[in-house]
Each structure stands twice: as C-alpha cells, then as structure tokens.
Regions:
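Aromatic-lined carbohydrate-binding surfaces of glycoside hydrolases
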Residues: 1-174, 183
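Conserved small/polar residues in nucleotide/adenosyl-binding loops
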Residues: 180-186
C-alpha cells in the first residue's frame, strides 16, 4: 500500500526530499532527475493501492475518490515549490476526479489510460466504447484543473518486443487530445 497521505508528518518529509533533489547540481543527479527540470512528479506508487486508515477513508469518502486525498497531499507539496510544476497521476484508484478538492495552480494531472482494454487491438480513446469512463474522467478533471497530460500506453505489455500496429490509433488519440486542449505524453 501507499503511504498514509493524511499523516501530518508525510508532507514535511516529501517537501524535504523533493527540495534536496531540486537543489542538487546537474552533475549530481541522474539523467532522469535533471535538477533544472520544470516538472516534478509526486505520485502514488505503481500497483500498490491506497491507504485505508480511518482518516484516509473519511477523506476519500468526502471527495468520492482517493484522488481527493492524493490532491490534498500534492497541493501541500506544490505550495512549497510555486515555480515548479508538480505532476501527479490520475491512475487506477486516483483516476476519478474528486468532488471538492481542486489541484493547486501549479499541479498538473497526468491521466493514465492503463485500465482500459488496450491489449492486442488498440482502440481509439475518442470513439471506443471501451474508453467511455476514461473520457468521462478526462472531462471531469478538465473542469477542475489548468493542465492535464495524457499518458497513452502505446505498447503491448504481453510481449514488449512484438510488432504493435497502432499508428492509426496513435494519430486518433493525439488528435482527440489536441482537440480537448490537453497535452499528449507518449
């Protein structure tokens, strides 16, 4: 499980950790963690699930989704880095937009479509019935935030090196993302 996002000590540790990364010189950081970067990710762990303590459950229930609890935490981090973009995933249990909590102005939502059936045949996000809930979530997030990145999975996870003829779908997805004034991340 992810850490408890309602733990009052967690933002302090996350802010210090991120600040140390940002303060490092270029020679001290790996290529993937360029300290001059404008975007920094503060996101949930991959595939673990959210904290289910009483405080987190209450927060999740209030916002109708664990994304609200995540955003409350991320907003605390973003407040300390006003000149950086703090990106966070809308992914698995945080994909549904919260009812009340809104991202800070420097928080970027990175929508991920991994839950939808994309194996074998690739279906376009804009028109496929399989992606109806993703489209709804995308619209809902668009109502409450300034910037959304879309992480479109353009790979077949069952066999990473096999040919995956998805160029036409990629184009459809880029066009639909551009049409909705979002930024595509592939």
């Amino acid at each position: 499980r992810d850490r408890c996002l309602t733990n009052p000590e967690l933002p302090y540790h996350a802010i210090n950790s991120l600040n140390r990364l940002i303060q490092k010189t270029q020679a001290e950081v790996p290529v993937w963690a360029d300290s001059l970067a404008h975007y920094w990710s503060v996101s949930q762990m991959d595939g673990r699930g959210n904290c289910t303590c009483q405080q987190c459950q209450t927060s999740d229930l209030h916002d109708g989704s664990p994304s609200g609890t995540m955003l409350k935490f991320v907003n605390q981090i973003a407040e300390h880095f006003p000149h950086k973009k703090i990106a966070t995933l809308a992914y698995t249990y945080t994909r549904k937009a919260p009812l009340y909590t809104k991202p800070a102005s420097n928080v970027v939502i990175q929508m991920c479509a991994i839950e939808t059936a994309r194996q074998g045949i690739n279906f376009p996000i804009a028109t496929s019935n399989i992606h109806a809930t993703f489209r709804k979530d995308l619209v809902d997030w668009g109502k409450i935030c300034n910037e959304i990145l879309v992480w479109d999975y353009v790979i077949q996870f069952q066999n990473l090196v096999s040919p995956f003829p998805n160029f036409s779908t990629m184009q459809d997805n880029i066009n639909s993302v551009s049409y909705t004034h979002l930024r595509a991340h592939e």
